[in-house]
Amino acid sequence: MKIYQHQNSEKTKIGSVDITSGQMTFFDPYPQTHFPNRLDQILDNGNFEVLLYKFKNPPKDNGIIAIEVVFKNSEPIKWQDANYFEDPKSDFHYTNSCGFISDTSIFQNETIISLNDRIDKVATTRNENELNYCQLEFDNKVKCVYFECGIGWYDQVVDLKWGFDNEEKICRLLVDFHSYLL
């Protein structure tokens, strides 16, 4: 599962997510009519960097290999599928080739329509040949990350994996799009 060490991948920091409630939500915002289930794992509060791994040679249209949220600087020594923990949100279903990572607390003051409007204002300013991602802020304090994981419409499900350090503590969350190709 050492995707970040593969010779054909490169890592880019695409932002950070603030966890203030101890719970995180990860979903494709566009096909939704309501906010989805949160991840059940209770997390430490803090600001955590979000990394994007993509193919570097040759570049691919849907070149994202994985998205990783880093909770601790320690390296994972083992990975577990989220469904192993009977988490109700054990995978990432995406239809519109995008994803959104945030603390669940933002949904107290947002609707899915207002969230999509915010994303549209920022995401439409990108260069068409670039992978798109952006950092969003709510109430000038809660940071969230939006990204596109391909071009066009898909109906796919990918696994969410929790990474654990040598103290058996959660240190990473990995959304694995294409690592089976490496």
Question: Residue locations for each model-derived region?
Answer:
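Intrinsically disordered, low-complexity acidic regions enriched in Pro/Ser/Thr
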Residues: 1-182
